Amino acid sequence: MKKVFLIVLFSLFIVFLNFTINSCSPEEKIIEKQMIQISDEELIEKNSAIYKTREINGKERKFLSSDFSRIEKPSSLDEFTQYFHNPPLRQHRTGTCWSFATTSFLESELKRLEKGDVKLSEIYTVYWEYVEKARGFIKQKGKQSLGQGSEHNAVTERMKKYGAVPASAYSGLLRGQEEHNHSKLFREIRNYLTFCKENKYWDEEKAISYVKSILNKHLGTPPETIEVDGKSMTPKEYLENVLQLPLDDYVCFMSLKSLPFYTKGEYKVPDNWWHSEEYYNVPLDEFFDAIVNSLKNGHTVALGGDVSEPGISSAEDIAIVPTYDILQKLIDQDSREFRFYNRTSTDDHAIHAVG
């Protein structure tokens, strides 16, 4: 049975448009109309847009948000059905949500598959993703996006090539460090690869060796062997013989009108820097049903979405679709497509849905 990664383009995917067709006599031209019924309550209970401030890089910045004071929200996570997941970890000052979310998903899968409670290293995968990203940049002679972000299926692809290790074997933190911060690390990688591009220096072996030296300086050298239950093994042996994750069973879905439905194609966002075309494209109702049915049947789901919308607040721990943005009944395949097309909404964060 296939398990799923699901790429959610933004937080407005949860409600759909109902369709009705006008009745007409045979001689009349048939016209299909989309009818939307909006109740008085929905017009009254509108949300207010307000400006808030927060500190970004030491400076106070204004940003558009919502007034959440009148919104009723659940009082506790105990109100929800939850499946096993390890406690959430902070990615701190890194762009590695893709690894943290997907690693958490795979840990939940290990528990579901009766492999026990396992805590894997997110940064081990990040290390090799940065290496592969640099390799791609050199191979493409600089014609490739370069950032810390990536996609869910990068984790499974890097595991297939480099294996996996427990978090205890590789933290990605140097002695005395308590928080991840890849700002300086990635700046050094970017500066070096920019130098390569400007000087047309495309020696892949030497370039990757230098990038690894930067990574080793900031993250520590990843282990070539690890010890598990008294046995020494490589990261690939740990993945294949101990974890035994069915990595080929995990697939990506998206819902976009730019590609024919029921085909596979490329998810065109910067974080899909290697132009993976392994995304199954399905209509929005089936896309949504896949999420709901997975959760109802005991599977957790790795999601990609937009958390920079004004209806989302981490401080309030709440997410809504504000009425000043778009009424929920107007959200459908087309409105979603329009927002993705004009970049109002995009894919800027990965999360793990656990119930």
Question: Model-derived features: where do they sit?
Answer:
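Positively charged n-region of N-terminal signal peptides that target proteins for export
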Residues: 1-4
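Short amphipathic alpha-helical "recognition" segments used for binding
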Residues: 6-7, 111
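Bacterial N-terminal signal peptides
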Residues: 8-18
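Bacterial Sec-dependent signal peptides at the C-terminal "C-region" and cleavage site
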Residues: 16-29
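Catalytic-core signature of thiol
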Residues: 26-354
